């Protein structure tokens, strides 16, 4: 089948921002103006097309990333609307991994907000070119120039305004196109679908000229040819400048800025024009690199239908009508319904049942997908998020998606025996969909423990378990996910010998342990020379150490950032086997870790409180009493912003305390920053609690 839309006319984009900046409202307008929907859905009414989950409609927030496809100026745009709440950071992470470009939406009053910084850093990590949309320019206190300034200062980015607003707050009626130097004015009665091109109002001419000159200079700085013309004082055409801006945007040297109000239907078409004009097609991005699992060598795949098939699974979802849906991004080649594909991450071949184009939670069946497409697949049984599927004759494993580890957990107990069976199925399905959701069993109490990124995250997962899977359960109080690590180097040996008639068991190893760089995780180094331990027993030792890491040595928490070197040992010709060396590895590690000054690590959150000036003292005092470190204060839109680092354990119930301290006039946001060593008194209390002893005073 021939390609319906040439690859250079395709865009894969995400819409990302801080919670409440207006991402979903912007997406709803995009769908309306591109003819994808015939009625505008509203978040506050619970009718937004992209927020289709019951929990999203009730809370007025986006929880999952919903995918859709629309057409603008004969260009196909695949859009993923991502959540802005920090608890759903995994949804943003996995979407950005497979997108070619993004629209970052900012609130015109606040500019850059805490979660805007988080998603911006995530986009930097995956080198995703972006354009910025300053939304809510009609809101009281809107300030276009301040919003741009926050992008420059707080994100350390180079924004370039390509539009300037005509009027602010309730006087906003259109934008100035800084390339053509014309005013675009919208009509309220036409639902924003039409605008007139007029001359720039006289009172704004000077400001528009200054912004035009700044734009020309910024674009010229990124392009040698244009710079030469600029220095010579030659006139540059709008087409030349736009081509230069496209190159600079794709190279992430600059970020074009547009402006409007999605809710009042102004500025959305010009945003769509910018998506088509400046964001990359799959042909504009570098080829993807992966490893051939057979040879271990790196290989590249470019966006070409004729190359071998390669795609990345970035999301798994359970659909009540068709079962498990796997969302994939195709990087090269093509695939038809009924074809067999090779899961190169797992080494298994599977058959494609159906291929679906998704529009939020509605499905459209298609027969074939090609390079650059994003779609859903039915029929893949063993796949997990981050797996690569490829052509079996040309296997390739692409770089997977990294997800943050959960920082908060609760115990869940089914109410009846039938709930217990249903709960197991429900939790497995939810864990398969969400890589930041973990399910485990407490070895002492036998309780089921679920862990996630925050209280809201767990609340929504429990709500889904009850509604979608009809499970009734009691939920415990939130608990903090502590970690353990070591501070010194130490050595130990593990010797496991068992003699039980016939062949026995013999495993013996000597190891050195030491701290690894924070965030580097576990590292195993094999320094065995001369065959003192045969090659086939090295992996079981590594496995035994990994299992010992899971239970720590202080309070049973996972141990992280540890380097282990295996340097000596011995074996028995008859009695040695894999199990004996696995046990020996575990014994050696536990002994070495106890000698290596083990410490408890606690998750620390980056907290930002926006508060009226008169309550600032009480907020700072409260954060200090929670073991918080004040990192900075700044003035923003008539309020003070207090930034602090606070241990997660001290933040439970903070929202109620903050509201009562400020008569409900403050707001706060927090996201996970890092793990750091817990103070001795706190660590002793936690260890004593786990071991069931009173803490030493």
Swiss-Prot record:
GO cellular component: cytoplasm
Assigned protein family: Belongs to the TRAFAC class translation factor GTPase superfamily. Classic translation factor GTPase family. EF-G/EF-2 subfamily.
Molecular-function GO terms, alphabetical: GTP binding; GTPase activity; translation elongation factor activity
Entries under SMART domains matching the protein: EFG_C (SM00838), EFG_IV (SM00889)
Gene Ontology annotations of biological process type: ribosome disassembly
Keyword vocabulary terms for this entry: Cytoplasm, Elongation factor, GTP-binding, Nucleotide-binding, Protein biosynthesis
NCBIfam families cross-referenced by the UniProt entry: EF-G, PRK12740.1-3, PRK12740.1-5, PRK13351.1-1, small_GTP
Domain tr-type G: 8-283
Binding site for GTP: 17-24, 81-85, 135-138
Protein name stated in the entry: Elongation factor G
Main subcellular location: cytoplasm
Cell compartment(s), UniProt: Cytoplasm
Species annotation: Koribacter versatilis (strain Ellin345)
Disulfide bonds: none
InterPro entries in alphabetical order: EFG_II, EFG_III, EFG_III/V, EFG_IV, EFG_V, EFG_V-like, EFTu-like_2, G_TR_CS
Function per UniProt: Catalyzes the GTP-dependent ribosomal translocation step during translation elongation. During this step, the ribosome changes from the pre-translocational (PRE) to the post-translocational (POST) state as the newly formed A-site-bound peptidyl-tRNA and P-site-bound deacylated tRNA move to the P and E sites, respectively. Catalyzes the coordinated movement of the two tRNA molecules, the mRNA and conformational changes in the ribosome.
């Amino acid at each position: 089948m021939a390609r319906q839309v040439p690859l250079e006319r395709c865009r894969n984009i995400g819409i990302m921002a801080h919670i409440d900046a207006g991402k979903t409202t912007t997406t709803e307008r995009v769908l309306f103006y591109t003819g994808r929907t015939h009625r505008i859905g509203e978040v506050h009414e619970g009718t937004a097309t992209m927020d289709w989950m019951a929990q999203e409609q009730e809370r007025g927030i986006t929880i999952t990333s919903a995918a859709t496809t629309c057409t603008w100026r004969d260009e196909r745009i695949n859009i993923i609307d991502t959540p802005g709440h920090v608890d759903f950071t995994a949804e943003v992470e996995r979407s950005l991994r497979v997108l070619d470009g993004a629209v970052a939406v900012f609130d015109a009053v606040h500019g850059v907000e805490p979660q805007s910084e988080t998603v911006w850093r995530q986009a930097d990590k995956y080198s995703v070119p972006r354009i910025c949309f300053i939304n809510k320019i009609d809101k009281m206190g809107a300030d276009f120039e301040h919003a741009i300034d926050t992008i420059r200062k707080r994100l350390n980015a180079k924004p370039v305004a390509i539009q300037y607003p005509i009027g602010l707050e309730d006087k906003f009626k259109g934008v100035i196109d800084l390339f053509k130097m014309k005013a675009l004015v919208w009509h309220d009665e036409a639902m924003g679908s039409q605008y007139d091109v007029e001359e720039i109002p006289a009172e704004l001419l000077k400001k528009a000229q200054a912004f035009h000159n700044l734009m020309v200079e910024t674009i010229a700085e990124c392009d040698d040819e244009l710079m030469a013309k600029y220095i010579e004082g030659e006139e540059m055409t709008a087409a030349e400048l736009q081509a230069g801006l496209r190159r600079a945007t794709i190279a992430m040297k600059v970020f074009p800025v547009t402006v409007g109000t999605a809710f009042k239907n102004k500025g959305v078409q010009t945003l769509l024009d910018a998506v088509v004009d400046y964001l990359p097609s799959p042909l504009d991005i570098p080829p993807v690199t992966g490893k051939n699992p057979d040879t271990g060598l790196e290989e590249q795949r470019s966006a070409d239908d004729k190359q071998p098939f390669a795609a990345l699974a970035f999301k798994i979802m359970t659909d009540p009508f068709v079962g498990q849906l796997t969302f994939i991004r195709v990087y090269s080649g093509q695939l038809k319904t009924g074809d067999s594909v090779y899961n190169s991450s797992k080494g298994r071949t599977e058959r494609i049942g159906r291929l679906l184009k998704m529009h939020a939670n509605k499905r459209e069946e298609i027969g074939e997908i090609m390079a650059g497409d994003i779609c859903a697949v039915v029929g893949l049984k063993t796949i997990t998020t981050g797996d690569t599927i490829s052509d079996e004759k040309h296997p390739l494993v692409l770089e997977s998606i990294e997800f943050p580890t959960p920082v908060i957990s609760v115990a869940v107990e089914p109410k009846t025996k039938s709930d217990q069976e249903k709960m197991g199925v429900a939790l497995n399905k939810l864990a398969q969909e969400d890589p930041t959701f973990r399910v485990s069993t407490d070895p002492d109490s036998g309780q089921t423990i679920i862990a996630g990124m925050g209280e809201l995250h767990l609340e929504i997962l429990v709500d889904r378990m009850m509604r979608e899977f009809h499970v009734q359960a009691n939920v415990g109080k939130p608990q903090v996910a502590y970690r353990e690590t070591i501070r010194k180097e130490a050595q130990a040996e593990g010797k496991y010998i068992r003699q039980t008639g016939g062949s026995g068991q013999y495993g013996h190893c000597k190891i050195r342990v030491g701290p690894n760089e924070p965030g580097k995780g576990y590292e195993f180094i094999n320094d065995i020379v001369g065959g003192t331990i045969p090659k086939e027993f090295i992996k079981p030792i590594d496995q035994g150490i990994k299992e010992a890491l899971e239970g720590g040595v202080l309070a049973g928490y996972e141990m992280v950032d540890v380097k282990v070197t295996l340097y000596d040992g011995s074996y028995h010709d008859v009695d040695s086997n894999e199990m004996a060396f696995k046990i020996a590895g575990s014994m050696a590690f536990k002994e070495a870790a106890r000698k290596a000054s083990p410490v408890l690590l606690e998750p620390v959150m980056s907290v930002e409180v926006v508060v009226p000036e008169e309550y600032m003292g009480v907020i700072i005092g409260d954060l200090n009493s929670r073991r918080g470190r004040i990192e900075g204060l700044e003035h923003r839109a008539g309020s003070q912003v207090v930034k602090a680092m606070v241990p997660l354990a001290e933040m439970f119930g903070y929202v109620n305390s903050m509201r009562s301290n400020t008569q409900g006039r403050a707001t706060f946001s927090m996201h996970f920053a890092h793990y750091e060593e817990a103070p001795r008194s706190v660590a002793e209390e936690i260890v004593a609690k786990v071991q069931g002893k009173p803490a030493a005073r």
